[in-house]
Structures are given as C-alpha cells and as structure tokens.
Design a protein with these regions (language model features):
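Extended catalytic core of nucleotide-activated donor transferases of GT-like folds
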Residues: 1-99, 117-120, 134-139, 264-267
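Nucleotide-sugar donor-binding catalytic core of glycosyltransferases
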Residues: 1, 102-267
Length: 267
C-alpha cells in the first residue's frame, strides 16, 4: 500500500527506541501490534514518571488481541490514551464490548487463513465506478499434495497443572471451580464465560460487570484445563484408533495414550 513500516526489535529495545523516535511522524504514524507487544511498559517505549512514547507523540495504538479478553485483564490497565482494541473472534468482540466499555473497540479482524468467501461477498462487477475485489472460490484453487494426513497444532499442558489453582483457596471454592469445569465438559457447545457467569450468578447473585470481569480473569485456569482436556481426548482417540497424528507444539511428550507410536512429535 506504499506505507513505510518500522519493525521494533524487542530484543534490542534501546537501539530500536532511538530509531523509532526518528521514524515517528506525529499525525501520520500509527502502532499496529499483537497481544500488547509494545504496550507492557517495555524499557524502550516507556519511562517511569513520563509514560509511553506513544502518548508523547500522540500515536494511535491498534492492538490485535489474539487470546480471550479475560487473559488480558491486568494488561488493560494503564494503557496509552489512544488505545484501540481489535478482536479476532466474534465472541471475544462481544465480551470485550460488554466488560470493558471504557475502551474504544475497533471491531473484528479475521485471522490469516480464514476463508474470505465466508466473510466477504463475491462481487466481480463494478460498484460506484470501482472494480470490487474478487476472492477465489474453493473450487478454483489448485490442489496441492498433502504431506500430513492429520495435524494438531498447539501446545499441550496436562490438566494436572491446573489442580493447584482449583484448590488454591479452600474446599468450597474448589468444588465451585470443579463444578464449572464439569459443566463445560458436559456441554461442549457452551463457552467458558457463558457457563462460568451462570455459576457465579447462581452462587453469588447479581454483580457489577467490573466484579465479574475480575472474577473471570481469576478463573483463566478453567479455560486452560478445558482446552487441554479436549486436546488430549482428540489426539488420544485418533492415535489409539491407529491413525497417525503429526503434532506441532510443546508438551505433547507428556500425553499418556495407548499407542504413542502413532503420535509424531515435531519441534
């Protein structure tokens, strides 16, 4: 599109910061980042008592948040004045708008790899004098030879990792947390926040959105537990049925299954 792009090297913050200041043009430059990189008070862009370089030069900050907002509760404190949040999931978008109304939300951006045919209307004609963009349909894509039949991408954490967090307060809270976990696993079509909020309301009555967003942040171990429970079960049922699965990610060597020879580990 013709824009100059500056890549900030987080492994060389101080040198990058010097170059960044020379690159910034107030009123023109914007920050585009993922998962709050450059917005966590890094040494090169933040100085105690002064603040962010983004505020110093009035740079708009567009943050593309990949994970669920309840993972970011603490990061959503003390951000630059011109902070704009972008979600990659429709449910994340709805959650953020409801529980963090004090922030400017800039909508939804699909991840790379999403089928644009499902997100955009095909239009090969002219509209208001401009040629619209045509996205290739599935049927006209050239077939490619597959190297792997079944792939699992993502890290694996045994559910035992979450046990200390389930029991971190007392037995009453542990039963509360375990009840949420069991409910989500029994009803996989429901989201973590949907079930957790239902249990919170049942146990504690109505609460403010600020209280609830803090409570959900403190229950992110439930998300980790359920996510890895289903990852474990999905891979186990396949490899134990004799299907070879190529897994890409950390922690899969800790998976216990009947036929580990069918699970091919990749770094």
């Amino acid at each position: 599109m013709g824009y100059n792009v500056f890549y900030f090297d987080l492994e060389d913050e101080m040198n990058s910061a010097k170059k960044l200041r020379r690159f910034i043009k107030p009123g023109e430059t914007v920050l585009v980042t993922f998962n709050f990189e450059g917005l966590e008070k890094e040494a090169g862009v933040y100085r105690e008592g002064i603040g962010y370089v983004w505020d110093e030069y009035a740079v708009p900050c567009y943050n593309i948040a990949v994970d669920h907002p309840y993972y970011y509760h603490e990061r959503l404190a003390d951000l630059p004045e011109k902070y704009y949040h972008i979600s990659i999931d429709r449910l994340h978008e709805a959650y953020f708008k409801h529980f963090y109304p004090e922030f400017m939300h800039r909508g939804f951006l699909p991840l790379a790899g999403s089928r644009l045919e499902e997100l955009c209307k095909l239009n090969t004609g002219k509209e208001e004098g401009k040629q619209s963009v045509e996205y290739p349909a599935e049927r006209i894509r050239k077939p490619v030879e597959k190297k792997y039949n079944v792939i699992m991408t993502g890290n694996f954490t045994p559910t035992s990792f979450c046990e200390p967090y389930i029991h971190w307060i007392n037995d009453e809270y542990a039963a509360f947390y375990q009840g949420i976990i069991d409910d989500i696993i029994a009803h996989p079509h429901r989201t973590v926040e949907e079930v957790a909020l239902e249990h919170c309301e049942r146990e504690m009555g109505e609460n403010t959105y600020k209280d609830l967003r803090m409570a959900l942040h403190r229950m992110i171990f439930i998300d980790i537990y359920v996510r890895n429970y289903w990852r474990r079960e999905a891979v186990k049922v396949l490899v134990d049925a004799g299907i070879q699965v190529d897994v890409f990610g950390k922690g899969w060597d800790e998976l216990t299954c009947g036929h580990p020879e069918n699970m091919i580990l990749h770094p």
